[in-house]
Amino acid sequence: MGDWSALGKLLDKVQAYSTAGGKVWLSVLFIFRILLLGTAVESAWGDEQSAFRCNTQQPGCENVCYDKSFPISHVRFWVLQIIFVSVPTLLYLAHVFYVMRKEEKLNKKEEELKVAQTDGVNVEMHLKQIEIKKFKYGIEEHGKVKMRGGLLRTYIISILFKSVFEVAFLLIQWYIYGFSLSAVYTCKRDPCPHQVDCFLSRPTEKTIFIIFMLVVSLVSLALNIIELFYVFFKGVKDRVKGRSDPYHATTGPLSPSKDCGSPKYAYFNGCSSPTAPLSPMSPPGYKLVTGDRNNSSCRNYNKQASEQNWANYSAEQNRMGQAGSTISNSHAQPFDFPDDNQNAKKVAAGHELQPLAIVDQRPSSRASSRASSRPRPDDLEI
C-alpha cells in the first residue's frame, strides 16, 4: 500500500496544538487505523479478487459477480475514510501555521517600533495595537498559541466535520456491505447463463477485521463528541472566569495603563500629585523640613515643635506691639495628622514627601528671653 509517512508527519504536528481529547483521537488514528491498515488488513484482502470463484466456466461471469458483491474494496474504502476524517484536522493545522506566520510578522514589526521608540518616536499606540492583534490571534509569550477566537472556531468546526464524516462512512459501509461477510454469494447477471454461486476466501477473518474497524470508528466518533463538549464548556468557563475575575480584567493585555504624568488625573489613577499640599501651613518665616509622616516619634515631635513655634511667634508679635487679634490662640492648637489608615492608602498610592520638624532659621538669644520678662516703657499700666 502507499506510503503514509507524509500524512503522519502532518498529523503529528497537530498534537502540539490540540486538546487532550484531540491527542487521544490522533493516537487512535495512527495506531488502530493507519498502522493496522498498512499491515494486517492489507494482507488479509490481498487475494480478494483472485480467490473469488464461481461455479461456472462462462468468461466474464466471475468479474461481474465480484463487481456486484463488492462495488469497492474494503481496504480502499477505509483509506478514503481515513483521508476524509483527517482533512478537517489538516485544515486546522493550516490555520495554526497562518497564525504562526502572523506572529512572525507582528514580532518583526514590534521590534522595528521599539527601535524607533529608543530614538524618541511616540509609538505607544502602535505597540498597543500589536498587543491587541496578538491577543486576538491567541498568541501568548514565548510563541505559544492559545486556542482562542478564530482558532477556537476552526477547531470546533474541524471536530464537527470529523464526526459527520465518521457517521457518513459508517452508514455507507452498512448500506453497501453490512458488517459481516458470507462465504457464498449468489449472482445472476449477464453474461452468466444462469444463477451461479460464488465463494469468498477467508470470510471469517475478514469479518473480524470489519468489526474491529467498526469499533475503532465508533471510538473515534465518541472521542469527537466528548472533545466537542469539553471545548464548548471550557470556552464558556474561561469566558465566565474572565468576566468575574477583576484582577484578570485589570491586569490583562488590554487594560489601560495609569497616567501618572498628568497632575489632573493623578489622584484618579492611584498616583500621587506633585502639586498636592503635603504638610500643614506654617507661620511666616518658618520652613518645614520634609520627612516620613508614618514615623510615630517624628509625628509627636512635629506636633510639639509646631505648638512651641506658634507660641513663640505670638509672644514676639505681642512684644512688638502688634494687634493681638492678628493671631489668636486658636492657631496654636495642635495639628492632627491624618489617621493611619489614610496614611497607609497614600503610601500605597505613591511615594509622598511628608513634613518633619519645623525649624526656625533665626538664632535664639538670651537677651530676647530676658527682655521678655522685664517691664518696658510702652507697657500698659493697670
UniProtKB/Swiss-Prot annotation:
Gap junction protein that acts as a regulator of bladder capacity. A gap junction consists of a cluster of closely packed pairs of transmembrane channels, the connexons, through which materials of low MW diffuse from one cell to a neighboring cell. Negative regulator of bladder functional capacity: acts by enhancing intercellular electrical and chemical transmission, thus sensitizing bladder muscles to cholinergic neural stimuli and causing them to contract. May play a role in cell growth inhibition through the regulation of NOV expression and localization. Residues 244-382 are annotated as: Interaction with NOV. Induction: In bladder smooth muscle cells, exhibits night/day variations with low levels during the sleep phase, at circadian time (CT) 4-8 (at protein level). Expression starts to increase around CT12 and forms a plateau during the active phase (CT16-24) (at protein level). The chain crosses the membrane at residues 24-44, 77-97, 156-176, 208-228. The gene is Gja1. There is a cross-link at K144, K237 (Glycyl lysine isopeptide (Lys-Gly) (interchain with G-Cter in SUMO)). GO terms for biological process: adult heart development; ATP transport; atrial ventricular junction remodeling; blood vessel morphogenesis; bone development; bone remodeling; cardiac conduction; cell communication by chemical coupling. Gene3D superfamilies: Connexin43, Gap junction channel protein cysteine-rich domain. It comes from the Eukaryota. A connexon is composed of a hexamer of connexins. Interacts with SGSM3. Interacts with RIC1/CIP150. Interacts with CNST and CSNK1D. Interacts (via C-terminus) with TJP1. Interacts (via C-terminus) with SRC (via SH3 domain). Interacts (not ubiquitinated) with UBQLN4 (via UBA domain). Interacts with NOV. Interacts with TMEM65. Interacts with ANK3/ANKG and PKP2. It is a multi-pass membrane protein. The modification Phosphothreonine is found at T275, T326. PROSITE patterns: CONNEXINS_1 (PS00407), CONNEXINS_2 (PS00408). InterPro entries: Alpha_helix_dom_sf, Connexin, Connexin43, Connexin43_C, Connexin_C, Connexin_CCC, Connexin_CS, Connexin_N. Residues 2-23, 98-155, 229-382 are cytoplasmic. Keywords: Acetylation, Cell junction, Cell membrane, Disulfide bond, Endoplasmic reticulum, Gap junction, Isopeptide bond, Membrane, Phosphoprotein, S-nitrosylation, Transmembrane, Transmembrane helix, Ubl conjugation. The lineage of its organism: Eukaryota, Metazoa, Chordata, Craniata, Vertebrata. It comes from Rattus norvegicus. Residues 45-76, 177-207 are extracellular. This is Gap junction alpha-1 protein. Residues 264-382 are annotated as: Interaction with UBQLN4. Residues 317-382 are annotated as: Disordered. Contains at least one intramolecular disulfide bond. Phosphorylation at Ser-325, Ser-328 and Ser-330 by CK1 modulates gap junction assembly. Phosphorylated at Ser-368 by PRKCG; phosphorylation induces disassembly of gap junction plaques and inhibition of gap junction activity. Phosphorylation at Ser-368 by PRKCD triggers its internalization into small vesicles leading to proteasome-mediated degradation.
